[in-house]
């Protein structure tokens, strides 16, 4: 007890975080280390690294130049997103009508967001420069010689080569992911739509009005709340069935093909893989034509008497001479799920085949000796093993299906027309996912403000589902390890 108590009292100190390390280095640094926070090159000059001083001074100077000539002018207008509309004015000097010096709201928003990121990057970089100079200071205090520029380059080509490799990808993530994400979030709090399109018109901040509109608080005439509930419900239903029908369908197909009683397993496996070889968009466009009101499949059903039978039992309206596979909500939802099974099951079959082949043979043999039948072995051994291995894959498949644009859009675009006026007023359809509704709002109706809100909601749905699922998966990950 005494030893354990003493060990607890003498635990190793925690590694300081980034801010704590910067604070320590700045306080204990010499004058050059402190000055490097404000002028990056001064610290390196004082510590004998002239080439590095030139490089960091150039980077800092370029960033400050951008802020001075592009950042600050736009940040000054960030609160209003511009006040001067584009119009023609008479120029006395040329005696002609010319375009005035107008404000572009989107340019102001874009440059402001980039400026915020540049400012944050400058502060973080300045803190790292201070820590770097403090390390140089400590080396010089011990009488050792600091690295020259060539030696520093060699370090980043050897010991710290990971930094060199990650530099471009990180810049790509910032430019193509972080900046657009911030702009998306910002647009959700503006009135950016077809009536406020730059450069001819200005848009401005509207606070949480767009979110109130989405959740039914936009007044008596607003239908976005109703449409959002309908579309979100179908999105989750679709994602559930699209994920698990493919999952279990692929498992069953893999088990049947790999069964010892199955003849020519390689032939059947190759046959089902044909759907993978054909590009998905080609398959979807062809199938859309097959299942159209006047398509081949409807002709076959009508000639076989299936259409008449479905009319007699009430599944097809009496006034129709076809089965509305892609033109009525219920039929369209069912058809889309069935077509997705045809497209997705072969992928899952290949994955399940690999996993089933890796189930320990002694586990199956022990179950067989204990008298387990095939059904019991499936539910007690094979399915739990598959779930333990493919749990993370199922989560990503669900998120992928929430955002499965191709299947829904290519099967229904130009074919399905909603009869629901409330949905039509919100530019939505019964078969829309959140992502296809978002796409239609931007491309067809230029309603960027509501599309941005929907984008945020899609992220929230996917993030919450992923966090919850991985929380439970991590609890059970050691079951079959």
Protein language model features and the residues they cover:
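N-terminal signal-anchor/first transmembrane alpha helix
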Residues: 2-32, 38-45, 50-53, 57-65, ...
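Intrinsically disordered, low-complexity, charge-biased terminal/linker regions in eukaryotic proteins
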Residues: 28, 35, 80-95, 99
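Transmembrane-helix bundle segments that line or gate the permeation/cavity pathway
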Residues: 48, 69-87, 117
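A structural signal for multi-pass alpha-helical bundles of membrane permease subunits
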Residues: 70-78, 161-481
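Short, membrane-exposed interhelical loops at transmembrane-helix boundaries
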Residues: 88-105, 371, 436, 440
């Amino acid at each position: 007890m005494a030893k354990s108590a003493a060990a607890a009292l003498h635990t190793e100190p925690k590694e300081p975080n980034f801010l704590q390390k910067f604070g320590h280095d700045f306080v204990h640094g010499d004058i050059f280390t402190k000055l490097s926070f404000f002028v990056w090159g001064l610290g390196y000059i004082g510590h004998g690294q002239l080439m590095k001083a030139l490089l960091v001074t150039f980077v800092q100077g370029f960033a400050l130049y951008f802020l001075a000539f592009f950042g600050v002018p736009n940040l000054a207008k960030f609160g209003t997103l511009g006040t001067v509309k584009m119009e023609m004015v008479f120029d006395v000097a040329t005696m002609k009508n010319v375009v005035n010096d107008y404000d572009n709201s989107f340019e102001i928003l874009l440059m402001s967001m980039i400026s915020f990121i540049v400012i944050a990057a400058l502060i973080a970089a300045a803190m790292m420069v201070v820590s770097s100079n403090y390390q140089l200071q400590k080396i010089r205090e011990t009488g050792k010689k600091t690295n020259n520029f060539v030696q520093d380059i060699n370090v980043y080509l050897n010991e710290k080569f990971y930094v060199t490799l990650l530099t471009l990808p990180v810049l790509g993530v910032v430019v193509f992911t972080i900046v657009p994400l911030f702009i998306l979030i910002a647009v959700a709090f503006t009135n950016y739509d077809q009536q406020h399109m730059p450069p001819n018109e200005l848009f401005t901040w509207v606070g949480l009005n767009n979110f109130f509109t989405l959740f039914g608080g936009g007044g008596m005439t607003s239908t976005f709340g109703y449409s959002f509930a309908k579309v979100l419900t179908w999105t989750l239903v679709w994602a559930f069935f699209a994920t698990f029908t493919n999952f279990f369908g692929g498992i069953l197909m893999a088990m049947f093909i790999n069964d010892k009683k199955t003849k020519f397993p390689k032939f059947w496996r190759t046959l089902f893989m044909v759907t993978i070889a054909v590009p998905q968009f080609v398959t979807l466009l062809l199938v859309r034509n097959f299942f159209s009101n006047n398509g081949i499949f409807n002709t076959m059903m009508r000639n076989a008497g299936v259409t008449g039978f479905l009319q007699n039992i009430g599944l097809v309206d009496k006034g129709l001479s076809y089965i509305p596979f892609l033109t009525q909500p219920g039929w369209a939802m069912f058809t889309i799920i069935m077509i997705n099974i045809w497209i997705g099951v072969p992928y899952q079959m290949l994955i399940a085949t690999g996993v089933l082949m890796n189930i320990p043979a002694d586990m199956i043999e022990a179950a067989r000796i204990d008298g387990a039948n095939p059904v019991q072995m499936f539910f007690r051994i094979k399915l739990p093993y598959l779930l333990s291995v493919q749990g993370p894959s199922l989560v990503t498949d669900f998120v992928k299906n929430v955002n499965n644009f191709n299947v829904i859009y290519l099967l229904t675009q130009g074919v399905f027309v909603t009869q629901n006026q409330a949905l039509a007023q919100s530019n939505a359809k019964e078969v829309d996912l959140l992502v296809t509704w978002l796409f239609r709002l931007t491309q067809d109706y230029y309603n960027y403000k509501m599309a941005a809100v929907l984008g945020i909601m899609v992220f929230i749905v996917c993030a919450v589902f992923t966090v919850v699922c991985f929380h439970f998966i991590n609890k059970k990950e050691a079951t079959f390890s």
